[in-house]
Amino acid sequence: MITGELKNKIDSLWDIFAAGGLVNPLEVIEQITYLMFIHDLDDSDNIRAKESAMLGLPYQSIFSDEVKIGERTIDGSQLKWSVFHDFPADRMYSVMQEWVFPFIKTLHSDKNSAYSKYMDDAIFKLPTPLVLSKVVDSLDEIYKMMNEIQTADVRGDVYEYLLSKIAQSGLNGQFRTPRHIIRMMVEMMDPSSEEVICDPACGTSGFLVASGEYLKEKKKEEIFFDKQKKDHYMNHMFHGYDMDRTMLRIGAMNMMTHGIDNPFIEYRDSLSDQNPDKDKYSLVLANPPFKGSLDAESVSGDLLKVCKTKKTELLFLSLFLRILKIGGRCACIVPDGVLFGSSKAHKDIRKEIVENQRLEAVISMPSGVFKPYAGVSTAILIFTKTEHGGTDDVWFYDMTADGFSLDDKRSPIAENDIPDIIERFKNPDKEADRKRTDKSFMVPKQDIVNNDYDLSINKYKEVEYVAVEYPPTYEIMTNIREIEMEIGKEMDELENLLNL
């Protein structure tokens, strides 16, 4: 999590935009995102150059030699943040407006790429050289503080804090999945170098970015020393859809900044007939929106065949089952109501997953996980698409701590179940003998069937009560009499003092 000092610095950056006349949170976050992307291009270009040198691979810097922008050819080094941030305000503004911004819009010549789709209509909106100069100085200070914190999540945490401004403004109702929860889900699924990964409600591409980072960390040599696997990683592995173009633009830049050149990020209503995907993906990672009900006419008919409902959280589960290949896996976040809802649609989708697919795990999370943006209680469902059943014993885990306080402050604390969750999930043989009073335990499929496919952990968890021994009744009564006598004595003394 980011420090209070860093939050204050981001708030100050936001105030610079407001003072310059940019007050729409969506516009502000777009402009900040562009500038962060320009800053990160410089850093990531340097990192890639070093990585290529270490691996003995050739690398062509995007800033090397001369760069053509429109009809003009300029020195590419002037496009680097580390160079132009020292320019006088007027010159910096001119370079940014005339060179840097047009340059980032043309980084991908492939007009079908995610980056090109969502940068084509990007506009540089900072009004004056003075505002740009102040914003660049402020971002330099923010990056300096981020580097001092030196945690892998700090950049993502800054992004989350920026996105919280949208939520606070009441626009779009955006709130992000915490990065440590995303990372936990990715580690549990342990994606391979051959996965085809999809998030049908991708937002800023958090799950896709985390999957890419995990693969680079765990399977770097396997992917980057194999031409076909590297091509798959860069161009075919990652698929994300959303209905918010601002989020898609941020998501596309987020992916590219993390070294994924050409993810398939597309504007799409995943629940409508506009989405043709079927039996396509090997892994779905998602935290779909729980925004209530949809217009039934806008929902794809085949999703309603599994469970006839207007509730998005149920329809997305139906969608996951449709878009997964046989053998494909899913880890998704659902509101608690999905686990125990008594409507026919709730029971139908749970029955479908338990009876016709293979439900593997239900991880109950505390309601504070999404604070300060939302207080909803949620759980993680993990299942595999089989179309012929296979559910045996289902693993339940009762998460009570995630390393942060569960209030609005979300301050770091020592208690953290996440390492234990990952360890236990990856070693199922050790789980079979656990009692239902433990943090985790197995529940046979038949127990779930007998309970109307209820998947809430409290339905199966047992509480161990410790017997309390009280003294005999006569002893308690004697103590009460003694207390009464003491009270009477004190009352007599008080009356004497008051001359009553």
Residue ranges, per PLM feature:
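Short acidic (Asp/Glu) and glycine-rich catalytic loops that position anionic groups and cofactors
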Residues: 11, 137, 231, 261-265, ...
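C-terminal, active-site-flanking charged/polar segments
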Residues: 358-359, 371-421
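Short beta-alpha connecting loops at secondary-structure transitions
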Residues: 236-239, 268, 299-305, 364-366, ...
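Conserved S-adenosyl-L-methionine
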Residues: 172-286, 291-295, 301-302, 310, ...
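Hydrophobic alpha-helical scaffolding
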Residues: 148, 201, 240-244, 283, ...
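Non-catalytic, mostly N-terminal accessory regions of nucleic-acid modification and defense proteins
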Residues: 1-193, 264-275, 364-368, 391-405, ...
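Conserved nucleotide-binding/hydrolysis micro-motifs of P-loop NTPases
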Residues: 42, 204, 246, 272, ...
